[in-house]
Amino acid sequence: MKTAGGAVALVRNFSGLAREFKDGELFSRMLETLSGEAYFAGLANRLEREKITPVFYGGEGYPKAWLTLADAPLCLYAKGELSLLKDELFAVVGSRRTVDSARKLGGKIAEELTARFAVLTGSADGGDETALRGALDGGKAVCLLAGGFGFAPKENPLLVRVEKEGLLLSACPLDTPVRVFSYEYRNKLLAAMSVGVLVLGAAEKSGALITAKYAAAMCKKLFAIPYAPSVLAGAGCNQLIKNGAYLTETANDILEKYGYEGVEKKKIPLTETEEKAVEFITERGEAHVSEISSALNIPTYRLATMLSALEVKGAVVKLGGNRYSVV
């Protein structure tokens, strides 16, 4: 109420603001700038120069789900493959501290989801980044920034790739910096424009849970990757599952909820010894190098080479402390 009262007072006394700015000098300059053609001509030239397409409220390509939001942006700025706005969007998000095994799995799921959806995510390190890479490999990646294009890190090779191969979006004016509150608003928009959300990793208090909160409030399907109870970086995911989110281990767990046929699992060519190693790790969930070496009777120096090969093939992922799990 204090904020609203301040805003009301500001509007009521707006005419008096001119006197505060050197008898209206600054006010007049602002009014002149916005009233003249030069400002808008400069903006149009910048949009064309930077290959940014404005998508206006209610216009073609504007997310229909945003039209129901009281605080919907008046304009969506886009760079890249605009046709992806016509696809069904599925959001895959995760905290910066998403563990390696979940990131590996999340990237694979994101890639396979592109068989039916365009995958939507943010641009943060960790879960968002791995989802973005997987979606790019699948050919349908959409990234929604928290700030304006003027503040997007131009040296970020991943975002450059999104511009060229996917679609980069911003709901903010070009030179809007990222503030603390920017992420929650972005996450709300992300949840609204997607048909569902998968959370790859989230502690008890994580930005990824904000996206999940809005998705649940909007009656979107919610999915989460399960974690061992001892992994604090996944406590938020486990809580989502307890609260009704779908436990997710493969892309098929998601696709089937939308009535789509599952993606056929690719057979990874393995040697007999590699198959035994994968089987051993699978039975235990994860295993230390010494345990695998003892079970297969293979010296650790030889095993290290084999495990590296299995990582390259996408069969296993290395965890901390010389431990491995299957993908």
Language-model segment annotations:
Residues 1-61, 224, 315-327:
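Short, small/acidic-rich helices and loops at N termini and domain boundaries
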